[in-house]
């Protein structure tokens, strides 16, 4: 849990919100070091993928800073770039998550494998597509969100806190979408609720929720949380000796959360 992780890290003054804020402040990467830090983490994740999963050592994703975008990070696969929104603060753990999510073993590896499989005929042509708001888009995000777990890269209490925090905030973005589209609340009403529950500033939350108005990005909001949960639930059942077979099953088939769990043996 977040509380246990913070205690282990020495942030144990008693108030969870204050301890978490202090830990995040202490691990924030300075803005001018964000891109170099992400680049280093991309190098590390690529090496780990080549060692235990797939050899993508000839592939690269160049990190590029952007501003005023409706996303934190975006995998521009055709141009092999990771666009990172520098309007937001990032801890080193958040950048580690983004390196694995957007590139190795996340979107870059997933899309690269689909391309290979379509080219050699082992996957039908529509397998190369990523369709917004489809059942398979959940797995597209779920694979990426479990990247650190696939690489056995959750090796510190800080990693554990960061993953728990990322999942909490992902769930809260689903709540925000429901409040906006079903309950018809304004963004001014939603932001303070999500900020308080997610232990973030209202400024950060307002920026993070901008994608709820974006035609392409908005439909993916539920895919992140649901996909992460779906992949994590099956991954926990996979013994180490079966990991390579599982990855082929996961990356090489257009799954939904239901089929992923139903047909894995």
What name fits each language-model region?
Residues 1-265:
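N-terminal maturation segment of proteins
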């Amino acid at each position: 849990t977040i509380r246990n992780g913070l205690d282990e890290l020495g942030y144990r003054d008693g108030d969870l919100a204050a301890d978490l804020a202090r830990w995040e402040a202490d691990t924030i990467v300075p803005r001018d070091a964000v891109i170099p830090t992400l680049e280093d983490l991309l190098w590390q994740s690529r090496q780990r993928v080549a060692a235990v999963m797939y050899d993508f050592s000839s592939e690269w994703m160049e990190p590029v800073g952007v501003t005023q975008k409706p996303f934190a990070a975006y995998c521009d696969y055709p141009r092999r770039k990771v666009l990172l929104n520098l309007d937001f603060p990032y801890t080193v753990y958040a950048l580690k998550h983004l390196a694995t999510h957007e590139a190795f073993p996340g979107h870059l590896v997933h899309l690269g494998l689909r391309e290979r499989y379509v080219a050699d005929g082992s996957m039908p042509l529509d397998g190369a597509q990523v369709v917004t708001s489809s059942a398979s888009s959940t797995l597209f995000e779920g694979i990426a969100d479990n990247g650190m777990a696939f690489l056995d890269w959750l090796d510190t209490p800080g990693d554990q806190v960061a993953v728990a925090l990322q999942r909490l905030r992902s769930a809260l973005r689903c709540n925000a979408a429901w409040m906006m589209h079903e309950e018809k609340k304004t963004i001014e009403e939603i932001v303070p609720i999500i900020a308080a529950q997610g232990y973030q500033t209202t400024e950060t939350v307002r920026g993070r929720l901008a994608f709820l108005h974006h035609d392409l990005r908005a439909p993916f909001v539920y895919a992140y949380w649901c996909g992460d949960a779906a992949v994590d639930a099956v991954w926990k059942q996979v013994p180490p000796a079966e990991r390579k077979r599982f990855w082929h099953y996961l990356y090489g088939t257009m799954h939904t959360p239901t089929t992923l769990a139903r047909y894995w043996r």
